[in-house]
Amino acid sequence: MDELRIDLRNATSEEIAQGVKDAQLCFKLNHTMPYTDEYDDLVQKLFGEFGESSRLMTPTTVVRGKNVKIGKRVVIMNNSLFMSAGGITIEDDVLVAANAQLISNNHAP
């Protein structure tokens, strides 16, 4: 498997725009009442896949959320961090503890 390195000095305009969009979605999600349609809609927009009956407790930080796939009946507790340039998959029936950091990218030296 090739190692994916992130070099922010060479980011494309599309990558920058997606980063801004993800940051804004995270901010809005972190300030939205949970268990509402608006909250659920923001979660669906932020992640690549978000399974049925799964819950995300805020606050959270998500970078490149479209690379994150969450299975069914997953609970992610508060203060989670997803840095997902290399992709992150959480399968069905998983509990992610509070303050968990899921990181699949590397930075250029």
Where on the chain are the PLM-derived regions?
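Flexible, glycine/small-residue-enriched loop-and-beta-strand segment within the central core
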Residues: 37, 60-70, 75-109
